[in-house]
Amino acid sequence: VILVGCCPGGTASNVITYIAGGDVALSVGMTIVSTLAAPLMTPFLVYVLAGAWVEVSFWAMVISVVKVILIPVLLGVFLRSLAGEHVDKVSDVMPLVSVVAIVMIIGGIVAVNAEKIVSCGVLVLGVVAIHNFCGMMLGFLAAKIFHVEYSRTTAIAIEVGMQNSGLAVSLAAANFAANPLATLPGAIFSVWHNIAGSIFAGIRRAGAENLAELDRIREIDCCNCEKQ
């Protein structure tokens, strides 16, 4: 569980931020920075908090950033510049496509780790849920304290609450091979943070739509006042 918390943000957080109507650029930027810092910060934090040393390859992280984040972002920018009108036509359905993709990912993870998840009991699931909730609330409250705007608050809360659980599973398997359950928290987190993140995204997206409606009403009122 500590190892999961010490890992950088995962790319799933970018998708959840998009579904939530948050600041995707900020989310991607935070993921890139935390991933590049992971070779230094993850071993240091795990050593301080758990008294164990894990090795994280810097170049593996760089390659991961390029393949999973930079290339998709650049392709998206290129596609929008090439066929912007067509992209705008399908942009409204993309959140639904993202949700379907996340459901398929969750299904795959559960299928692969079904035996471990069933055998873990309520304890590990509860700890993972609390871990995820506290991370999101920490990011949310920190953003609120500094009066960060709505979309960026959403991005920060999601980014802080969702870690790269796939990396956590890989590191646990490589560094704690003697303990077969070491990969369990990461596997459960892979499922849970997508579920909790999707719920949070739905709440924040509804809030964003309400704010947009209020802004529209205020603009109409202002126009009416000016006419009078």
What are these regions (language model features)?
Residues V1-Q228:
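Alpha-helical transmembrane segments of multi-pass small-molecule/ion transporters
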